[in-house]
Every structure is written in C-alpha cells, then in structure tokens.
C-alpha cells in the first residue's frame, strides 16, 4: 500500500519538476547593466530559446504582471539565471531568486503616441522642462519597448525621476520610435496610490497554509482560467468555497491574494454592511453585488463574516436575517453554469451558519485554515521580517518553535512589538522636538533576538486571550526531589512533542492524561507548571469550581470551550486543579440543581475521548481526595497514569530546602542536612514556610538595625562618617532556629495512612508484579486456544483469589 502511494507521489513530483524545468523559466539575478529596458541571458540559453541579441521578449512575473524588454547576451550569467535591474524587477513584482518566464515577442509595433506622468515625490522642487531634461535623452535613438503600467527611472540633471506609463497606442505595449509622440502633461501621480498597488497581496505574502492554498488555487484558478477542463470532463466546477478557522489565520488575506493573482474582478461584501433597516433593501444589496460580479466576470465575490448574514434560520428571531439567507441561497443557485463567478466566504463560526448553505452546489468546499505549525510559523515570520533590519543573532527558527498556538496575526504583532522595543532602546538618542532624526541613529537601529524575547514575553496567542494562558516561569530546579515523577512526566509530555516519529515507528498513540494525588503541599501544582514550561507548551489552568455556573447547560459549554481552546493552541497542557470538586463519583450529588456536576463529568469524559490523536493536548489532574473521584475518569485512555506524590523523604527535603534558598544569601554554618533530618513528615509547602519565616526574621532584623543606625547618626553625626558593613548580610542559624519554633506539620499521620492505603489498593488492583510469559511458548503473537489450564494460567493466578468472572 505504502509503496503504491510513494510511487504515485514520485510521479507527481517528477511531473511538477519537469514542468518547473521548462527552459523558459529562469531565476532572477542582479543586473550588471543598469539599463531599464535590457535583460541579460547566457549565450547557450539564448541559443536554446532561439533568441538573438536585440530581440524583444515578454517577461511574466508575479500577480499577472508582464514587461517587455530587449535581450542581450552576458558571458558572466549562468544558464538558469536572467539578469535584470531593480526597475524591471519592481514592474514584474519579483525579487532576486524568484522564478519568471520569458518568451519571444516579435510582433511589438512602433508606438504612435504614449502618455507618461512623473511620480510626485521624485519631481518636488524640479523646475524646467521634464521632457527636455529627462524623457528626450532617455528615449532618443534607443527604440525602447514599454508597457502600459510600467514605472521607469530616468537619471538626468542632478536627480533621478520616476515616470509611469499611463497610456500607449497601440496598447498594451509598443516600441518608442523617433516619430512616437510623447505626452507628459497632467498632474503627477501620488506615491501613495502607487504604493497601494505595489503592496497588493500575492501568494508569496501568505505563509503557514501551503496545503490549503494549493486546494484553493485548484478550486478557484481552474474554473476561472480554464473552464473548458470541466466542460471536457463533464462536471460542474465548484461554485462556492467556505474558509473557516480561528481569527487571524489569514482567511481574508487568502481571498485577496487569489483575486490579485488571478486578475479576477474582486467584490468584497462585509457581512454586517449589507444589513439595512429598510424592508427589502438588504436583499437588494445582495442582488446588486451578484449582478455586478456577473457583469465583470471572471469575478470573485468574497463574503467576510458570513455568520453575520447567514445564521441558522430556526435560531434567529429577526425576519430580515431569514430573508437574507433565503436570498443568498437563491442567488447561489441562480449563478449561470459558466458565469465564471466564484463565491468565497470566511467565518470563524462555521457551526452557526445555516446548513442549507453548506450543501453541494452552494458552499460545497470547506477549507479549514487552522493554526500554523512550526514550519508554517517560520514562513510567516520570514514574510513579516523581510523588510525589517534584523541583527545577526536573530534566530527565527527558535522564535517559531517558541510561539505555539500563535496565528499569523499574532506573529505580525510579535514582529512589530520587537521592532518597537528596538526603537525604545534608542529613545534617549532621539530628540522628539527635532524634525529629522540623526542618520547615525537610523543606521544603528536593528531588531535583536533580545527584542524578540521581550516581545514573546509580552504576547500570548489571540485564541487564548480570555483564558489566561501563561507559560509558567517554574523550572525543574525549583522542584526538589521527585526525580521518578519528573522523568515520568517528561516522557508523557515532552516525548510526543519532541519525538513524534518514535510513536509512529512503534505504532502507538501517546497517552493523554495524568492524575497526581497525594497530601496537600507536596508540589502537585508546581509539577504541572514546570512540565508546561520545560517543553514550551501553552498552559491552561482550570480551577474546578470556576466551571460551574447557575445556568442550565452553561457549565458543560464552559468545558467544551476550554477543550476547543486547548486544541487550537496545541501543544497545550490542560491542568485541572482540585479535580475532586468537579469530578465526584456520579449519582452521589443529591440536590445539586438538576445534576449539574454529573453533566459536567459526562462532558469532560466525552471531551477526553474526543481528543484527536494529532493534537498534542495533555490533561493533568491534581487532587488530594482521590477516593471520591469518578472511576470512569481514572480508566486507561483518559487519566491513565496515576502518580502518587508522597511526602518528601530526607533526600528530597534537602533538595526542596536548597531549591527554596537558591537565590538567598545563607550563612555557611546553616546545616540544611540536619534541618532536613529534623523535619520528618513535613510537606514541601511546610518546608517553604520555614524558609520564608527565616527570611522574614532576617529582613526584620536588618530593618531594625538600619533604623537604629539612622537614630545614632542623627544624635551623633561625626561618629558615623565611616561606612559600616551591612549588619545582616545573610540568613543565619538563629533565624532558622527561631523559625523552627513556629514550624508545624500540615498533614497528620492519619491522613498519610489513608493515601498510602489508596496507593496500595491501586497498585494491587492494577499491577501483575510477578507476570512472565511461559518460557516454552515462543510462538505467535496471540495465545493458543488450548492453554487455559496449563502453566500459562498459574503464572499470575494466586490460590486464594476468588474468581469473580468464572
């Protein structure tokens, strides 16, 4: 099966490569010759394409842009490259390294007349005749080919002026001969208008959704450009495409790019703008939009925020919305078979759209524009930083790996935040009163990796703005002891994120959940925070009681929402603190307002089962009452690993004390080992409290000595001239001794016995400590039919076990 798929993939890729290797597709390189009308190829390539020196060629760039130039040979140019200067590159909307196509264009006629206008900011302050100084010397005896819409740069006098070709006769391209009439009357063209067309979005400006973009191209470009294909095969081309996904992933951007690249007429309908208070006007607005598009075919109608104008009819109370939905349905059915009109729509709430719109023949294709993965994020970052001045230490790959759950809009915000931070650093060198900024300051501006790190600390994914998602600042060093638990946790969360290939190799899906149980104050919450930080996953902390609300059905909706958010921001750790408050055993909650708690548990169970294996969402529960939790949650496949976090032993207590005091100045003679020995039965929280109290006593003493010294200085100023040492430079033994007088255990022996019992019963009910396969049976993977009573059975069946299933 796999080999068939592989060979199919290979055939496809070789076909694509062959297509890419067409001889007339060349890579753009920097020109040596600065002439605006000349491109250079190597002599072998010119021979291959049957071109001669001085031939006119048509170049095709991006966004359906074309240019006509004269071709010359250049010995220094390699065969697969074409040399062109910046003016030609801008006209073709390409950069160095992009691919363009070239073809002979022998039938370019001499122009009768052309109309060119300068760009306003390049002619400011120029007096004199533009034609005499600039245009006449530029075109004289040059026989330059030009195309309508081209911008060209002319150097003359002391300045360089940019001109735009507004009109040519014959259109769209011609050669400017000696008898061509050149008009240059009229208002100069505004730079802003020009910039807008330059900044049109193309496929290059979209990152992170290659697969979806390929799908959309196929569904939009083929019907618009080659409708005959569908006619030949005898099917109807797709009519409508629905783009859905979280906000900020680039749905509107994709629609604009498709329109620019296909050159189709683009009609934008912003959902809410269609609405009108007059009866019947909203529907007529829709009808007008479709009529306009049919007139200007090929056309793309793009409806943004579709859910605003086409909600489910049974759920809306307004008559207007229902009529608009019906009107949209009839319009989409009424589109003529080959009207070359495609309707695209975008929404981030696909489930609130009327189902009649989502059938075949209307919005028959739905494309999920999801949250990008690490490679997608890197593409997006490269697009947003291509015009930014980056320092050498900026590692965009690292930034991409650390921005889990960020969509394109978040990454754009991140880049601008990093740039602002770079400017902030130089603010003291910038005088806001001055009109101009010193050139040295401008040149020294560059965005460094530190600026990106700062921006990262300030930003979190927009999908998770409501549920505060923090990647906690807790590391493994903050947690003393619990080495086995740490390793277990790393295997659970870090392996699936960092080594997904291993799980594929062994053919198993990673486990999804863990339950920590144990006495209070042993670091259950701290562990969950540390694991989220260590593998750079997003972290959503859910306090159990917050989920429950007074409204019927609201609590379950809260659970659904949280799981949806976690899936969007994957990899994500969902941490349920105090799980026993929302997952009590069902049936025992009498009088809790219609069994709300039971329904919440049911919702959590179904959500845990519905976690798709591709999304790295991990659930960690923490409780100190494991005995009252519903057993269905504890089965394998949900919270399948139950980890007992006991009170720390002596070695762990030393580690906890060291972790707590690692940033504090402690006197050399404070024996932490002895302190750990004396605090048997203390939890991590109790030990932290001892450290805090000792620290507080040291601070108190320090403040008192400063006050005393201040008084002495006031009474006897001359005696206090000499600078004294800090009277309390560190936390001393007596501080710890004083703190130990107030120390108390928060967990009684009785409580510990309960936990130990629960852990033991779990171990017995789950583990087969003495299980071994029988040595004689080396056969197949499954047990043989007749081995019921042989040696195989006696390995793990003990004599005193009652066989409840016999």
UniProtKB/Swiss-Prot annotation:
Phosphoserine: which positions carry it? 3, 7, 13, 37, 462, 702, 770, 775, 787
Q: Which domain of life, per UniProt?
A: Eukaryota
Q: What happens upon changing residue 86 to A?
A: Strongly increased affinity for ATP. Strongly reduced affinity for ADP
Where Phosphotyrosine occurs along the chain?
805
Full protein name: Transitional endoplasmic reticulum ATPase
UniProt xrefs under InterPro entries: AAA+_ATPase (IPR003593), AAA_ATPase_CDC48 (IPR005938), AAA_ATPase_domain (IPR050168), AAA_lid_3 (IPR041569), Asp_de-COase-like_dom_sf (IPR009010), ATPase_AAA_core (IPR003959), ATPase_AAA_CS (IPR003960), Cdc48_dom2 (IPR004201)
Q: Which residues carry this modification: N6,N6,N6-trimethyllysine?
A: 315
Sorted keywords for this record are:
Acetylation, Amyotrophic lateral sclerosis, ATP-binding, Autophagy, Charcot-Marie-Tooth disease, Cytoplasm, Disease variant, DNA damage, DNA repair, Endoplasmic reticulum, Hydrolase, Isopeptide bond, Lipid-binding, Methylation, Neurodegeneration, Neuropathy, Nucleotide-binding, Nucleus, Phosphoprotein, Transport, Ubl conjugation, Ubl conjugation pathway
